[in-house]
C-alpha cells in the first residue's frame, strides 16, 4: 500500500438496483435513533403509513448523507412490480479528498451504512422512518485501490445485501453496487470543464458538478454480471439525486466534491451473494416477468446525468448532434446566376443526409459562396450559385429573405449597384422600404443637381441645350468640379474626357437673383441680358467646336474673331492680330499691341494678351497644335476661348464676349498665368489658401477653373455681383486706359519661357483655392461703397462674365505663367493673389476675383482681392507707375484684409 503524504482525490459511486421487502410494509416503530443516522429533519413522530414511499440513504464516514429516491421521486408512492419489490436503478457519485493513509485507516474500521427509509407525504415533509439498514465494508476495496502504485485504480463490487430492522430482524434485501476510485492528487486532469466550488461541510469545500456518462456500458455490465434474481438490466441506469458529502471530524481533512451522475460500472463487479431463501420467490417472479423495459428506457433518457468519462476505463459514447435543417442552393445545370432579377438563394430544409454547413452569401460581391455537398459529387461554386425559379420555392425564398432585413438590404443594394432592377418588390423588407426608391423616380439630373446647388439654380435661368454646344472637354471638367462642389486641382494637360451626365449651367443662383431683385433690379436685368448673350455664344461655339482638329486652329480663332455682330471693330482688330500672331512671328504681336494701344485700355490689354498668347503659341508651334486639337483645344466656350492645355491660355474669345467682359480678362489672365509659375499664389483674405504655383498645375487648374467658371462665373466671380452691379454697368461704359506695350511684349517673351515650364508642370495637378463661403459678406459688403475707376470697372466687368469663368482656368495656368502677363488678367478673375510680374494684369485679375471662389466672388469686390495687394507688392515700380489708375481703384482691398474687419450686420441674412 502506497500512502502519499499529500491528500488525494477519491471517488465513490453508488447504484441501487432494487429493494425487496419480504412481508410487505412493516409497522415501523418510532425510534429516536433514526434521526441520528439521518440529516437533522426534526418533526413529530410520523404515523405508520401503508403506502410505501422508500428512499435509500448512504453514510460514508462523517460525510453528508446521500439520498437516492425511486423514479417517482421523494415522498411519492413507489411503483411495485410485485408486492414488496421496488425498482430504483438510480445512484450517485461523490468525490472527497483525504490522505490515503487516513482513508485506509478509517474504512478499515467504519463501514458504509445503507439505510432504507420511509418518507411519508406531507408538508412540511415529516421525519423519515427507518425501515431497515445494512452495513457494507469497504476495507477490501480501499486496500486494493491504495495497493496500486499508480493513481486511477478503482475497485468495484456489486451484490445483494440483507436489510435488518432495529430489532435485527431481516426485512428484505437491497441490491446495489459501488466503486471506489483513486483519482490522484488533482481533479484538473479528470474534468473537462470547470467546477463551481461552493463552501460546504464542516471543514471542507464541496464542489458540485454536472457530469455525463453513457448508460450503455452500465447496462452491458449488468447484463453480464447481474444475477438472474436481480431486475433486468434495462432498468439499471437511473438519474441520481444530488448528494452532499460533508466531511466532519478533525482527522478527516478531505474536501467533498459532489456530482450528479449515473454510476457507470465498466470494471468487472463481483457478484454479490443473493439470499435465495429470502428472495427466491421474488427472484423467480422477476426473472419470469421483468419490469416494463420501455418505461425504464424513457426514465433513463430523461433522468440520466453522466459523469465525465475520465472516471472510467471506457470512454463514453459521443452523442451525435441532432440533424438540423440546412440552407442549401440547388444547382441547376442550365441555369445561370440571376442576381440581376433579384433572385436570392434558395433555402431548403434538407433531410439529415445533407450535413453540409449552412451556405453563406458574399454580400460584397453579390455572389453565393456556399457549396452544396451532394452525396455523389461536390458541386462547383459557380453551379451552387445558380438558383431555382420554381414558384413554391420562390415564395418561400421571398418570405425567408423578408425575415432577414440586413441580408435583404444587402441584396437590394447589390441589385441597385449593378443597375439590375429587383425582380420582386416584396424582397424589400417593410422596415427598409423607405431606403429604396424606384430608379424611375431618380432622373439623371437629380444626381447632378445634388452635386452642385449652383448648377441647379443656373438651370432655371439658362437653357441647357446651349450648354450642350459647349465643348465636351469643358463640360466634363465642369461636371467633375460641380460634383465635388469645389474647384479642385486638375490632373494635368488636356482635360480628361468624361461622360456628360447632365446639363451644366452656371449663372445667377436663386438666392442671388432674389437679392438682386431687392437691391438692384436693374442689375438683374443686365444679368439676364448677359445670359441670353451667353446662350448665343455657346450655340455658336458648339458648332465651331465640332470642326475637325486640323481646322480648329483657324476656326477657333478666325471664326470667333470674325463674328461681327458682337465684336467691336477694335476687338476684331485685336482678334485678327492675335490670330496672325499665332501663325506668325512675335513681331506681329508687337504690332498688334501697337494697334490696340490706340483703342481703349481694355482693348489694348486684350490685344496685348492675345499677342502674347499668340507669341507663346507661335514659339511653341507643337504645343499650339496640341492645344488646338479637339481633345486638348480649350476653345473659350461662351465668352473667352482660352487654350489652357499645357499651361497655355489663349484669350481670343474674350473679344467675342460682351464689350464689358470681353477683352481684358482673357488676355491678362494668359499673361499672368505664365508668370505665376515660380511664385506662390496668395489667395486673398476671401480666397484663404496659399498655393505654391510650382506644386499646382496652373495649366490644368486654370483649365478646370475656366471650365467651371464659363458657366458659373458670370454671377459670382465677376465683379458684377449683386453688390457690384453698379460697377459692372460702369465697366460696360467705361473706356480703359492704354496699356504699355512693354508689358505685353515682356509678357510674351516670358510667356514663351513659361510655356516650356508649363508643359513640365502641366503633369502636376494644380490645387485650386477653396471657394469663399457664401456666408462671408465681407467682399460683397465692401463692393457697394467702393468706387472703381472706369478702367477697373471695365476690366472687372469683362472678367466677370467671361474671364471669371476662364480665369479660373487661366488662374491655374497663370500661376505657372506668372511672368507672362500678370497684369490685369490676374486681378480680374483671380482672387488668388498671384505674384505677377505685370502689375496691370494682376490688378484686373484681382478685381475679377478667382472663379474658384465664384460663389462668394460674386459678392467680393474686385478691389478687395488680396491678390491685387500681393501683386502690387511683387510688381516692379515701373508696373506701379504704369498702372496708377488701376492701383487707385484698389484702395478697398487694402481697407479690409481680414474677415474680422467686415461689418456683417449690414448684410441681411448673414451671420458670422
UniProtKB/Swiss-Prot annotation:
Feature: compositional bias, Polar residues: 211-229, 266-295, 735-768, 841-859
Location of this chain's protein in the cell: Cytoplasm, Cytoskeleton; Cytoplasm, Cytoskeleton, Spindle pole; Cytoplasm, Cytoskeleton, Microtubule organizing center, Centrosome; Midbody
Biased composition (Low complexity): 347-362, 796-807
Region annotation Disordered: where it falls in the sequence: 31-50, 209-239, 254-296, 335-366, 443-469, 730-859
GO biological process: cell division; cytoplasmic microtubule organization; mitotic spindle midzone assembly; positive regulation of cytokinesis; regulation of microtubule-based process
Biased composition (Basic and acidic residues): 254-263, 452-468
Residues of the signal peptide: none
Keyword Cell cycle: yes
Function according to Swiss-Prot or TrEMBL: Microtubule-associated protein (MAP) that plays a role in the regulation of cell division; promotes microtubule stability and participates in the organization of the spindle midzone and normal progress of cytokinesis.
Assembly and oligomerization: Interacts (via middle region) with microtubules.
Location (main, coarse): cytoplasm
Provenance organism: Bos taurus (Bovine)
Name used for this protein in its record: Microtubule-associated protein 10
Keywords: Cell cycle, Cell division, Cytoplasm, Cytoskeleton
Keyword field contains Cell division: yes
GO CC, one annotated term: mitotic spindle pole
Listed GO MF terms: microtubule binding
Amino acid at each position: 500500500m502506497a500512502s502519499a503524504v499529500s491528500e488525494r482525490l477519491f471517488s465513490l459511486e453508488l447504484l441501487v438496483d432494487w429493494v425487496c421487502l419480504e412481508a410487505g410494509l412493516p409497522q415501523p416503530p418510532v425510534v429516536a435513533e433514526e434521526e441520528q443516522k439521518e440529516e437533522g429533519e426534526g418533526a413529530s413522530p410520523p404515523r405508520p403509513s401503508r403506502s410505501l414511499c422508500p428512499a435509500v440513504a448512504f453514510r460514508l464516514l462523517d460525510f453528508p448523507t446521500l439520498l437516492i429516491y425511486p423514479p417517482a421521486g421523494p415522498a411519492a408512492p413507489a411503483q411495485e412490480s410485485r408486492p414488496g419489490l421496488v425498482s430504483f436503478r438510480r445512484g450517485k457519485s461523490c468525490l472527497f479528498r483525504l490522505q490515503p493513509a487516513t482513508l485506509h485507516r478509517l474504512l478499515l474500521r467504519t463501514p458504509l451504512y445503507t439505510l432504507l427509509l420511509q418518507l411519508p407525504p406531507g408538508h412540511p415533509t415529516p421525519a423519515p422512518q427507518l425501515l431497515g439498514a445494512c452495513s457494507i465494508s469497504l476495507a477490501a476495496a480501499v486496500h486494493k485501490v491504495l495497493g496500486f502504485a499508480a493513481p486511477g485504480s478503482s475497485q468495484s463490487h456489486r451484490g445483494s445485501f440483507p436489510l435488518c430492522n432495529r430489532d435485527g430482524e431481516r426485512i428484505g434485501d437491497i441490491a446495489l453496487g459501488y466503486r471506489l476510485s483513486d483519482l490522484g492528487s488533482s481533479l484538473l486532469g479528470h474534468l473537462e470543464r470547470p467546477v463551481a466550488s461552493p463552501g460546504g461541510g464542516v471543514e471542507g469545500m464541496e464542489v458540485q458538478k454536472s457530469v455525463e456518462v453513457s448508460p450503455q456500458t452500465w447496462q452491458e455490465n449488468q447484463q453480464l454480471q447481474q444475477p438472474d434474481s436481480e431486475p433486468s438490466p434495462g432498468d439499471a441506469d437511473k438519474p441520481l439525486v444530488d448528494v452532499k458529502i460533508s466531511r466532519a471530524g478533525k482527522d478527516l481533512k478531505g474536501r467533498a466534491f459532489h456530482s450528479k451522475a449515473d454510476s457507470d460500472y465498466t470494471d468487472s463487479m463481483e457478484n454479490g451473494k443473493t439470499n435465495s431463501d429470502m428472495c427466491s420467490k421474488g427472484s423467480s417472479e422477476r426473472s419470469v416477468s421483468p419490469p416494463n423495459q420501455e418505461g425504464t428506457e424513457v426514465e433513463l433518457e430523461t433522468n440520466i446525468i453522466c459523469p465525465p468519462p475520465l472516471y472510467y476505463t471506457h470512454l463514453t459514447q459521443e452523442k451525435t448532434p441532432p440533424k438540423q435543417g440546412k440552407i442549401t442552393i440547388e444547382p441547376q445545370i442550365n441555369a445561370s446566376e440571376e442576381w440581376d432579377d433579384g433572385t436570392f438563394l434558395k433555402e431548403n430544409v434538407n433531410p439529415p443526409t445533407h450535413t453540409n454547413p449552412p451556405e453563406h452569401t458574399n454580400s460584397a460581391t453579390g455572389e453565393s459562396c456556399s457549396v452544396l455537398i451532394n452525396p455523389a459529387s461536390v458541386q462547383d461554386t459557380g453551379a451552387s450559385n445558380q438558383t431555382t425559379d420554381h414558384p413554391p420555392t420562390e415564395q418561400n425564398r421571398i418570405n425567408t429573405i423578408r425575415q432577414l432585413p440586413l441580408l435583404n438590404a444587402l441584396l437590394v443594394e447589390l441589385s441597385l449597384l449593378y443597375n439590375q432592377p429587383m425582380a420582386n418588390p416584396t424582397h424589400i423588407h417593410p422596415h427598409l422600404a423607405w431606403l429604396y426608391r424606384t430608379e424611375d423616380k431618380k432622373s439623371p439630373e437629380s444626381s447632378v443637381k445634388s452635386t452642385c446647388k449652383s448648377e441647379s439654380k443656373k438651370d432655371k435661368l439658362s437653357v441647357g441645350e446651349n450648354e450642350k454646344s459647349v465643348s465636351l472637354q469643358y463640360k466634363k471638367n465642369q461636371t467633375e468640379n460641380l460634383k465635388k462642389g469645389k474647384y479642385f486641382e486638375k490632373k494635368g494637360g488636356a482635360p480628361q474626357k468624361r461622360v456628360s451626365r447632365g446639363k451644366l449651367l452656371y449663372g445667377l443662383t436663386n438666392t442671388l437673383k432674389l437679392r438682386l431683385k431687392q437691391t438692384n433690379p436693374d442689375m438683374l436685368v443686365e444679368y439676364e441680358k448677359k445670359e441670353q448673350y451667353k446662350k448665343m455664344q455657346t450655340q455658336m461655339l458648339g458648332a465651331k467646336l465640332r470642326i475637325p482638329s486640323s481646322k480648329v486652329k483657324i476656326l477657333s480663332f478666325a471664326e470667333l474673331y470674325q463674328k461681327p455682330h458682337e465684336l467691336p471693330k477694335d476687338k476684331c482688330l485685336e482678334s485678327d492680330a492675335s490670330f496672325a500672331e499665332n501663325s506668325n512671328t512675335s513681331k506681329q504681336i508687337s504690332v498688334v499691341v501697337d494697334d490696340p494701344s490706340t483703342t481703349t485700355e481694355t482693348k489694348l490689354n486684350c490685344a496685348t494678351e492675345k499677342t502674347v498668347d499668340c507669341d507663346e503659341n507661335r514659339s511653341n508651334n507643337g504645343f499650339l497644335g496640341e492645344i488646338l486639337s479637339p481633345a486638348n483645344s480649350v476653345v473659350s466656350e461662351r465668352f473667352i476661348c482660352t487654350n489652357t492645355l499645357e499651361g497655355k491660355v489663349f484669350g481670343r474669345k474674350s473679344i467675342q464676349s460682351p464689350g464689358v467682359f470681353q477683352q481684358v480678362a482673357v488676355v491678362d489672365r494668359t499673361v499672368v498665368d505664365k508668370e505665376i509659375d515660380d511664385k506662390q499664389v496668395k489667395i486673398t483674405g476671401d480666397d484663404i489658401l496659399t498655393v505654391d504655383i510650382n506644386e499646382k498645375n496652373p495649366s490644368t487648374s486654370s483649365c478646370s477653373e475656366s471650365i467651371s467658371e464659363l458657366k458659373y462665373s458670370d454671377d459670382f466671380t465677376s465683379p458684377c455681383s449683386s453688390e457690384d452691379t453698379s460697377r459692372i454697368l460702369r465697366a460696360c461704359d467705361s473706356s480703359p486706359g492704354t496699356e504699355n506695350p512693354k508689358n505685353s511684349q515682356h509678357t510674351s517673351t516670358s510667356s514663351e519661357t513659361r510655356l516650356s515650364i508649363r508643359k513640365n508642370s502641366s503633369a502636376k495637378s494644380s490645387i485650386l483655392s477653396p471657394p469663399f463661403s457664401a456666408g462671408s459678406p465681407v467682399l460683397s459688403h465692401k463692393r457697394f461703397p467702393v468706387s472703381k475707376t472706369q478702367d477697373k470697372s471695365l476690366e472687372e466687368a469683362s472678367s466677370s462674365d467671361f474671364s471669371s469663368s476662364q480665369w479660373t482656368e487661366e488662374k491655374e495656368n497663370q500661376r505657372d505663367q506668372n511672368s507672362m502677363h500678370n497684369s490685369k488678367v490676374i486681378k480680374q478673375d483671380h482672387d488668388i493673389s498671384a505674384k505677377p510680374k505685370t502689375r496691370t494684369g494682376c490688378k484686373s485679375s484681382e478685381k475679377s476675383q478667382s472663379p474658384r471662389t465664384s460663389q462668394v466672388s460674386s459678392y467680393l469686390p474686385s478691389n478687395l482681392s488680396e491678390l491685387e495687394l500681393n501683386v502690387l507688392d511683387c510688381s516692379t515700380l515701373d508696373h506701379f507707375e504704369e498702372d496708377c489708375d488701376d492701383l487707385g481703384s484698389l484702395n478697398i482691398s487694402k481697407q479690409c484684409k481680414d474677415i474680422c474687419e467686415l461689418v456683417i450686420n449690414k448684410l441681411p441674412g448673414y451671420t458670422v
